Amino acid sequence: MSQSLIVALDFPGKQDVEQFLRHFEGEELFVKVGMELFYKEGPAIITYLKEKGHKIFLDLKLHDIPNTVKSAMRSLASLDVDMVNVHAAGGSSMMKAAIEGLEEGKQEGKERPICIAVTQLTSTSETMMKKEIGIEKTLEEAVAHYAKLTKESGLDGVVCSTLEVPKLREVCGNEFVTVTPGIRLASDDVNDQVRVATPKRARELGSSYIVVGRSITKAENPLEAYKTVKQQWEGVTV
């Protein structure tokens, strides 16, 4: 189950990544590479991480016209990443095009990357969604709508809050992948995310994967913090 614990490499460049990963010599991680790091270092950072034996969630949240997304996904699949994502708000045609691009670009003999969609960012509150985005639904209804559309479009799952997982299991079934960021240890600050949970709570609510950033990357001892999160996520009593 440790491979369903994703560590967010929210760093500005490769030097910071190298320094962080020194704490994990010999440990094969599942890491998330986001916009900041990928836009700075480009595909070379993916090659570097793959050579180290790590699995990669390339978190670029594509949202564009279908043809552009298809072409972009073809390129991303050729990098041999393990997971990618789009914004569900891009619509069904765009999401279907994403899958087509991944199938065309995947390396020979390998499965395409897992493809998930963002429903609502964990920084989005219901008030913000209604007043600023203009969606006149409850947050739960909006997330469920996007999740259902995602499944119908052939994607593997969604990025969502842990709090939304039980409802999505009802709507989309137990095989539908739920990747949940906003994970913090109980002692941590929540920072800029509104809908957060502990690893233990994420496990109880049925998340497929959890994404953990600052609780590990900003810890005085990242390896020990990783082990603590892993134990809580796996339900290990120490």
Swiss-Prot record:
Pathway: Pyrimidine metabolism; UMP biosynthesis via de novo pathway; UMP from orotate: step 2/2. It is an enzyme of class 4 (lyase). It comes from Bacillus thuringiensis subsp. konkukian (strain 97-27). Substrate binds at residues 10, 32, 59-68, 122, 184, 193, 213-214. Homodimer. The active site is at K61 (proton donor). Keywords: Decarboxylase, Lyase, Pyrimidine biosynthesis. It catalyses: orotidine 5'-phosphate + H(+) = UMP + CO2. Belongs to the OMP decarboxylase family. Type 1 subfamily. GO terms for molecular function: orotidine-5'-phosphate decarboxylase activity. The keyword DNA damage does not apply. One of its GO terms (cellular component) is cytosol. InterPro entries: Aldolase_TIM, OMPdecase, OMPdecase_AS, OMPdecase_bac, OMPdeCOase_dom, RibuloseP-bd_barrel. Its EC number is 4.1.1.23. One of its GO terms (biological process) is 'de novo' UMP biosynthetic process. It comes from the Bacteria. Catalyzes the decarboxylation of orotidine 5'-monophosphate (OMP) to uridine 5'-monophosphate (UMP). This is Orotidine 5'-phosphate decarboxylase.
